[in-house]
From Swiss-Prot:
Natural source organism: Phasianus colchicus colchicus
Keyword tags: Heme, Iron, Metal-binding, Oxygen transport, Transport
Ranges for domain Globin: 1-141
Official protein name in the record: Hemoglobin subunit alpha-A
Gene: HBAA
GO cellular component: blood microparticle; haptoglobin-hemoglobin complex; hemoglobin complex
SUPFAM superfamilies: Globin-like
Domain of life: Eukaryota
């Protein structure tokens, strides 16, 4: 459960992230594909080379969904319901991949905003990403 302080920390760090959705999303995806090669299996139709338009486009979608969740932080479940359906029923993405992508996203934020990612903000952002992952995997059960 996100506390009031967590919500403020997440909203604060996302003011720095929002203008870089495509860049940060693509970096997180590329990092995930390199670190966890098995995740590539969900993207057989993508050009997975560095800087590809498909990775940039999907990265932008990922971060846009996170921004939408931040904008509706008190109703992440309702906000991401359709996305949860898509990933559970149509795409059938292994739930562990949301955690892997979340970890990679945290690394990207740390690289670009080291001074803003204090231990408290890091913990809050991690809790938020875990909450998003929980929502996205809820329909698997």
């Amino acid at each position: 459960v996100l506390s009031a302080a967590d919500k403020n920390n997440v909203k604060g760090i996302f003011t720095k992230i929002a203008g870089h959705a495509e860049e940060y999303g693509a970096e997180a995806l590329e990092r995930m594909f390199i670190t966890y090669p098995s995740t590539k299996t969900y993207f057989p139709h993508f050009d997975l080379s560095h800087g590809s338009a498909q990775i940039k486009g999907h990265g932008k979608k990922v971060v846009a969904a996170l921004i939408e969740a931040v904008n509706h932080i008190d109703d992440i479940t309702g906000t991401l319901s359709k996305l949860s359906d898509l990933h559970a029923h149509k795409l059938r993405v292994d739930p562990v991949n949301f955690k892997l992508l979340g970890q990679c996203f945290l690394v990207v934020v740390a690289i670009h905003h080291p001074s803003a990612l204090t231990p408290e903000v890091h913990a809050s952002l991690d809790k938020f990403l875990c909450a998003v992952g929980t929502v996205l995997t809820a329909k698997y059960r």
